[in-house]
A protein has these predicted regions:
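Bacterial N-terminal signal peptides that target proteins for export
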Residues: 1-11
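Signal peptide processing junction and immediate N-terminal pro/mature segment
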Residues: 21-31
Length: 181
């Protein structure tokens, strides 16, 4: 007969493996739309470890419902998303790229922007929410915003606390056609 200690330890390992796996379904976008319209904007939302970025998928879905094509994925998928964005931009189907990320997704957002910069592609907006580690925002990013937890917020509630701000930035930047600074 298995002891409760062994069962508990096994359960913890299963839960940890589930959360660490980027492809268990929660990171797949319900808001991912067909390819961006001719010369349009696209928002990439990068979730943190185990896709445990409460409210960020819903934020991405709400932006998609407002007509901005949105892709919601786990932070580990940023290299493939960068390649997709490069192809879309170079083909003329994408004019404006915006990236939002939380925790490890915030760090990945900066990495993705840097990869786009190496391809000579501007990024309209990068929003990070309590990113892990300090990253230098690359020069191809027109505007960057970093939200950190403050009075009463924690690593997860920072998303809910700044949803309106994020919406304003994303919706405002999707209409902007200004040069990259």
């Amino acid at each position: 007969m298995a002891s409760w200690r062994g069962v508990s330890r096994s359960l913890v390992l299963v839960v940890c493996a589930f959360l660490a796996c980027p492809d268990h379904g929660y990171g797949r976008s319900r808001a991912h739309t067909a390819s961006p319209s001719q010369g349009g904007s696209h928002l990439y939302v990068l979730l943190g470890l185990g896709n445990n970025s409460l409210g960020l998928s819903e934020f991405g879905s709400s932006i998609a419902q407002r007509g901005i094509p949105t892709t919601i994925r786990n932070y580990g998928e940023w290299p493939a998303l960068a390649q997709e964005a490069i192809q879309q931009y170079q083909s003329g189907r994408l004019r404006s790229i915006m990236i939002v990320g939380h925790s490890l997704g915030g760090s990945a957002a900066v990495d993705m922007a840097a990869e786009l910069g190496r391809a000579g592609i501007p990024v309209q907006l990068v929003v990070t929410l309590d990113p892990v580690g300090a990253s230098q925002v690359p020069s191809n990013v027109r505007r960057s915003v970093n939200f950190l937890p403050r009075g009463g917020e924690d690593h997860f509630s920072v998303i809910a606390a700044h949803q309106r701000d994020m919406s304003n930035y994303v919706l405002g930047e999707s209409r902007s056609r200004g040069p990259v600074r």
